[in-house]
Amino acid sequence: PQIVDRLVWAGGLTMGWFSSLLVLTILRDVALFITDSAKWRVDSVLWVILAASTITVIGFINARKTARVKRVDIPITALPDALNGFTIVQITDVHVGPTIKGEYVRRIVRRVNNLAADAVAITGDVVDNTVDILSDQTAPLGQLRARHGSFVVTGNHEYYSGADDWMAEFRRLGLKTLSDEHVVID
C-alpha cells in the first residue's frame, strides 16, 4: 500500500538524518573538547543540524538516481582469444521494495541492455519483500538481454523474503538461477 511505502520512506529519511546528526554531534563534541572553545558551542549546534540535513538531502537525491555503470577490466593471463573482450554486467543490491519500484528496475534493465553484454550476473539482494508483493515490480528483469544469458544468485534479502519462491519467480522471468552450482558458457 502507498501509505506503507511513504512511512518507510519517512522512517528511512528520519533514521538517516538522526544517524548523521549523531556522528556530527560526536565529532563536534570532540572538537569542542580538544579546542576548549566555548564561543563555538551554540553556533556549532546550528552547523551540525544544517550539515545533517544537507547530508540527508544529498543521500535522498542519490538514492533516486539510476545505478551507475562502473567499468572494470580484469586482466587474465593466457586468456583464449575467443574470450578477449568478453563482457559481464553485474547487478547487485537493487533492493526492490517499499522505496525501489518497477520503474527503477526498468531503468536499470535499459541501461544494462544498452551495454550489449555477453552475460549478466545478478548477485543477490534483489528484493526486500515476498514474491506476491513484488512480482510486478521485478517483472522488468525478464527483459534483460545478454548473448549467453542472465544469471542470478540469492543474497540474504531473498532468504528473508522467501528464497525458494524468488528462485522460482526468477526462473519464470527467464533468468538462469544458480544455487551452489556453476555453469560452463560455450
Predicted features and spans:
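Soluble catalytic domains of enzymes that build or remodel membrane lipids, polysaccharides, and related
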Residues: 78-186
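Short, functionally important structural connectors and interaction interfaces within domains
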Residues: 2, 59-61, 66, 75, ...
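Non-catalytic terminal accessory segments
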Residues: 1-65
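Long, contiguous hydrophobic alpha-helical segments, chiefly transmembrane helices and signal peptides
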Residues: 10-25, 67-69, 94, 121, ...
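Sparse, context-dependent recognition of short Cys/His-centered cofactor- or disulfide-binding micro-motifs
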Residues: 42, 46, 52-59, 73, ...
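Hydrophobic alpha-helical transmembrane segments in integral membrane proteins
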Residues: 45-46, 54-79, 98-103
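Short amphipathic alpha-helical coupling elements at transmembrane boundaries
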Residues: 5-12, 36, 74, 89, ...
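Arginine residue identity/basic-tract feature
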Residues: 6, 17, 28, 40-41, ...
